[in-house]
Amino acid sequence: MIDSVSLNRLSGVRQMLRTFGGLNEGYACSEAELTAEKNFSSREFPALVTRKPRAKVRAIPKLNGSYHLNGMFTVEGTSIRYEAEGGAVTTLPNAVTDSEKQLVGIGTKILIWPDKKAFDTATRTVSNLGAAWTSGTGTVEISPCDSAGKTYTVARYGRTEPIDPKDGQMFLKVASMDSPWQSSSLLEVYNAAQEKWVILTLDYCKITATGIGKLFQSSDTITLSGTAAGEADQWEALDGECSLIEVHDNWILTRATPGGTRFYGKLTHTGSTAKWVSLNGNDIVECGSGYAVRLERKIPDLDYLTECDNRVWGCASKENVVYACKLGDPTNWYDYRGIASDSYAVTLGSEGAFTGAATCLGYVLFFKENCIHKLYGTKPSDYQVAGIRCAGVASGANKSLRVMNEVLFYLSLDGVMVWDGSLPQSVSASLKAEKLARVVRATGGTLGERYYLYTTTAANEQRLLVYDTTRGIWHEEDAIGQEMCSTGRQLYLWDGRILWAADPDREETDRETDTVDYELCTGDIGLDTPDDKYLSRVNVRLDALETGVVSLWVSYDGGAWEEAGHAQADEKYTRLNLPFAPARCDTLRLRLTGHGQIALRSIAMTVAAAGGNRVALSVKA
């Protein structure tokens, strides 16, 4: 039998939350997690603290790219600025075009695309990766020569050698008197000491012109074009790609396969005209006009870049090709000589544009939205590219690629992913997928054990999400980070006008800091008790780390926010209590707002449950 005392008896249970999770935008957000927040951090876990104030570094009206290599490198409009770790600053105005850059480091150099330039952090100079030279109105002489670059003339030719030759005498032994200058003839020199004729092999080509070699260096692979060698029928194929054996200011040496009916002679270009003269000077062939000799060290157009094993790797969506530069030499991308230091290129069969490139665990990775291409091997002869269909990098999110603790983080169409050498896995289950799917641009950065991800949508909705990789917790900070640069010791974020340092304690000099405006909303409190109950008392306990006012708000059963109280800290490191007696409800949510620095220590709740089963009671008639 139920009496009136038992029917209305309340049993109180005191509950306390002392371990706080992070952002959970899903339907299953618990009371210890946050449905929404701004500027909180898990750095003092299990307590919930506000992020550190950011240190103002300097104003930058336009930032097209940033990179850290022995110092901070920034592309600001058309200017380059480099601040070495020792503090010396170098500024180079009008060094590049005013466009967004793709940057990668190799050795002491920072490579800049699409400008195809390199900044040397040692010499503080900018140079072009590619080079081109054109003859213009000048004179260019092209002659067959030996490996030392020596050219020869000959006075006599015939089917048989002279009877009484002198030491060093030259002779061209021909197969046909009608075509004496063809490549099948043999150029010979008499050696008196050996008393025999020695054959000279002219399988090199010497190109002489004023200033022709100033832009190039030995071992460069260049593209030679605009010669009259084809019309003169000299060499098997002179125009095309060739490797420079020796380079001087006014002449260069390259290999060239002998061929043609007028091989033994000199080809001279003067302006746009050309003529061929035989080795004895007697036969002359006018080759017409319209020629312009050009030498070019070509650099491919690349969308995304990465460095691995002393090579720069890149991908080009227009060609669907992956490139690698010559070993240790980012100025040469078309050097194919069959050796281990060769350049490398391969066409991929997957559809779609490239969306990013990265290096992780010693592998070069190229991304599309729906696949990852992984490169195996140690040299061009055994390189292999394997593709797997999985969640790749989302379009516009190439700068979200960041490696931390040998794990690669990036934004995909399926959310934020981590790649550890196998298949990518999502770490963004607690974030709303619809928001991430609307992202059109994303950048990433790292600091300590935290991964920072800035996102923006077509409607200019901006967010800065921070993932604690140790605890698997997400937080959200006020949205800056259109450009980020991680140095290992610091993370720099650009808000469109000002460059900020994420952690002022890591800066060597005191800087002006921003004011942290914070806000958090808890999940529904009361869902863990499905029976009749009410909360008789709630006490929020926190530490104010600096002076300020903290406001507490409450929402009953999903209703409007009502202010439940506020507290003021007149001194630093003040412990504050915000108690209140909530109205009768099934569930409630709490909200904290303010500015400054606080640490949420605990939320204590006294829950009373009705003991008489009033709701379930049935009465017989």
Please report, for each region that a protein language model flagged, where it lies by residue.
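Extended assembly-interface regions of large multimeric machines
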Residues: 1-218, 230-236
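Short hydrophobic/aromatic-rich beta-strand motifs
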Residues: 72-74, 108-112, 162-189, 219-225, ...
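Short loop/turn segments that connect beta-strands within the blades of beta-propeller domains
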Residues: 76-77, 106-107, 113-115, 183, ...
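Small/polar beta-strand repeat architecture
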Residues: 8, 129-130, 190-220, 225-299
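Beta-propeller and closely related beta-pinwheel folds
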Residues: 53, 296-443
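Hydrophobic core register within WD40 beta-propeller blades
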Residues: 66, 103-104, 305, 357, ...
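Beta-sheet repeat architectures centered on beta-propellers
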Residues: 1-70, 392-396, 403-407, 414-621
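Surface-exposed loop/turn elements that mediate protein-protein interactions on large endomembrane-trafficking
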Residues: 79-91, 119-131, 322-343, 375-383, ...
